Amino acid sequence: NDITVIDSNPDLVGQLTNSLDISGITGCASHPDVLESAGARDCDMVIATTQSDETNMIICQVSHSVFTIPRKIARIRSQSYLEINYSDLYQSEHLPIDVIISPEKEVAEAVISRLEIPCAFEIETFLGGKAQLIGISIDSTCPVINTPLRQLSQLFIDLNAIVLGIRRNTKLFVPDPDDQIFGDDQIYIFTTLEDRIRTLEIFGKVIQKGNRFIIVGGGNVGLTVAKKLEENKQNKVHCKLIELNRKKAELAADSLERTVILHGDGLDLNLLEEANISQANALLALTDDDKTNLLTCTRAKTSGCELVLSLVNDSSLNSLLKPMGIDAYINPRSTTVSSILRHVRHGRIRAVYTIGDAEAELIEAQVLGTSSLAGKTLRDIDWPEGVLVGAVMKGNEINIAKSNTVLDEGDIITVFYNSEVVNKVEKMLEVGINFF
């Protein structure tokens, strides 16, 4: 790929060009001359992710009108621009944006997904909603610790689940069949939805959904999460939202129907007790300040809250999560990056999910008839080191990959791999320089 980054900060451009194999331009990305200097006339795609919605819109408009760039992706944060009533705004004859990425919406959906499996610290759905990647922490009570993964496959022969990754002492690696799971490991399991509960039980985890939640932070993410919780008609939710800024608290009160709004500091123990923190099933720390989120979670945990979830923007803080008692976290940047990557990869790549701080990826792709993979068994394919195929979907049937599984044209496969081999994996899956 030939990638050019445009930014108004010359120091940032310098850092990127020195550390990555990319080109850089300093300037305003919405200006036609700057875009042209970046190679817009020969560009296949523009991704506008500045801090300004309006700038991102202009970038897409100029890219379309002046340079006829075929695909345009924009990050749009303001909820006003995302109202369903105004969806026609983004038609090609009006404002030509092909894909809109809303970070707040993506993060809110990730939060709701975590609440479905409280014992998981990370969840992502694949294969048309029929399978999930689930990250769980292992403790000494796990029934299958110190058991080789090969033996697990033999013990639970009909189980549609596989361990794709293990994080041990902060290092994430793709396991071999003879590797074992130890206490204090974090593991990533790929499983079908049908076998999800049984799989978690094998590793000593039980899904216990709650309906009493406390949200700290009434910004776009907190407000979106509260609205989604209110929409849950099957499980009547009791939700309280704490917001320090009075104007935001008043806006939340006007926007929400059943959520109780508390104006104050989420770190205030008296306020947490007023919110009945000891009886809450989960506290969601969703402010835009990492330290506030982490400290709020720690205070909630020591006050008896069952589950605490934090937004963490700075990945260097990840090593503090376990000592601080944080049960689950969401990195907004990683969530947004994964969303963007779904739309920029080559070949028939249908989905990409970034693991941790870009340590690894899980990719969902279609096997093309002209691909080097078609017609081969998995054991006959020369995969790079650090790659593991999770599942193969043939038609509507999903099966965990075996060494004798044959890949046919049209099959959908999920592949887990270390970030160092991204280009090699993509090369194996693509058949040309075409998006989608």
Language model features: what each stretch is:
Residues 1-436:
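Cytosolic regulatory regions of ion transport systems
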